[in-house]
Amino acid sequence: MLKLKTRPTGAVTSSHFELVEENVPDLEEGEILVKVLYLSFDPTQRGWLNDVKSYVPPVQIGEVMRAGSVGQVVDSRDSNFKSGDIVQGSFGWQEYAAVNSSSGIMPIQKVPEGIPPTSALSIYGITGLTAFFGMVDIGKPIEGDTVLVSGAAGATGSVAGQIARIKGAKNVIGIAG
């Protein structure tokens, strides 16, 4: 697992993290053991390294670096999950995570059957949800609108532009770079 060793003041480098090997913990009631399969690396993670108040608490020195993740349940002491379930949550930069399914930054959810697991970290994850709610609830494009998307080359911006077109925008202009 990778734990935060020091807080960066500029660019993030490997020196800010420490590779630590630990035994897989025994589960307590209500916990599941997840083998992490996929991690999402997002710009917001840089902000989580700063020791400032934000929409989520900062990653503390000595804590596993947080990340949106998809994994497979390998053991369960929670009746809502069984071995083999594919789940999404915030399991962090580690191979195995013992987590309580009802606590944490992101509640643990099963990835619906038929959805590629990696899509839970993109179009059906924070990226897609940010674009969806930003466009549908805030931007509210209507038939014939011209919509400008800043950051259109990024994950969220590219989805936002597509949603604008689906909602009827005549023109979608993207800023990239």
Give residue ranges: language-model regions:
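Conserved hydrophobic helix-helix packing surfaces used for dimerization/oligomerization
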Residues: M1, T146-V147, V172
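Glycine-rich beta-strand-centered segment in the early N-terminal region that forms part
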Residues: N23-F41, L49-W93
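Gly/Ala-rich phosphate-binding loop of Rossmann-like dinucleotide-binding domains
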Residues: A131, G161, R165-I166
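N-terminal Rossmann-fold NAD(P) dinucleotide-binding loop
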Residues: G157-S158
